[in-house]
């Protein structure tokens, strides 16, 4: 289990040292290290969690497993090192699942986070994507508001992973080919079915609804015209120097 720092302050010297280590260990850091970027708050920083993630994957045995807390942006990134790592893990079929957590779930960061589960023995298996972003309840924690998962919330997530059953608007169970078709996205929401509800109406019911819509629109148009006239009238009364 790992909760690496996401984007800490990083000096040029620190970045140069990391770059030198990465260059000497291409097997451990096959996708290199993220660039040093300017930040108004801390000066310069780097998305160092991507370096930690590569190191963790390299450290695992052939049947190794890991749970890693990452910024939720990682699961949908379409470019850069983040996308390359995610694509690599999916191509290798080492992903077991992802839980996208509610906002403000951690005291140390306001960044939305997800937990990535890696299992090198999951080749040919299924992947569970769980959207827990709407779960839990908000409470005051000192000066900040945090969101807390209840024991029952936690059990729902655990049961979904263990049973590998999809839950409407909550979780999906996929094979790796399905994930590849969605540009390697690990966001559960991108796989939820879009439902369109249809209502059968009789001719009389249809006519009644249409008349109601027309009446409402006419009322809105009239209110808009009244407001427009009022504004124009007040503008006419404005004079320079008043």
Question: What positions do the PLM features span?
Answer:
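A conserved structural/catalytic subdomain of Rossmann-like adenosyl-cofactor enzymes
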Residues: 1-242
């Amino acid at each position: 289990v790992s909760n690496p720092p996401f984007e800490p302050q990083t000096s040029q010297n620190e970045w140069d040292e990391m770059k030198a280590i990465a260059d000497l260990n291409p097997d451990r850091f096959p996708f290199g290290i993220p660039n040093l970027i300017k930040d108004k708050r801390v000066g310069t920083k780097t998305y160092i969690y991507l370096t930690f993630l590569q190191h963790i994957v390299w450290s695992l045995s052939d049947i190794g497993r890991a749970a890693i807390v990452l910024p939720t942006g990682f699961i949908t990134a379409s470019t850069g090192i983040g996308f390359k790592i995610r694509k690599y893990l999916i191509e290798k079929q080492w992903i077991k699942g992802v839980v996208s957590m509610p906002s403000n779930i951690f005291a140390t960061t306001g960044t939305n986070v997800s937990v990535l589960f890696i299992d090198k023995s999951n080749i040919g298996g299924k992947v569970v994507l769980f959207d827990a972003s709407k779960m839990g309840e908000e409470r005051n924690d000192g000066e900040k508001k945090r969101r807390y998962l209840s024991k029952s919330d936690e059990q729902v997530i655990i049961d979904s992973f263990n049973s590998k059953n999809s839950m409407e608007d909550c979780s999906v169970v996929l094979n790796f080919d399905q994930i590849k078709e969605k540009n390697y996205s690990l966001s559960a929401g991108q796989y939820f079915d879009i439902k369109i509800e249809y209502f059968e109406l009789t001719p009389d019911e249809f006519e009644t609804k249409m008349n109601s819509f027309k009446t409402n629109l006419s009322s809105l148009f009239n209110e808009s015209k009244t407001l427009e006239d009022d504004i124009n009238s007040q503008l006419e009364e404005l004079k320079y120097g008043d």
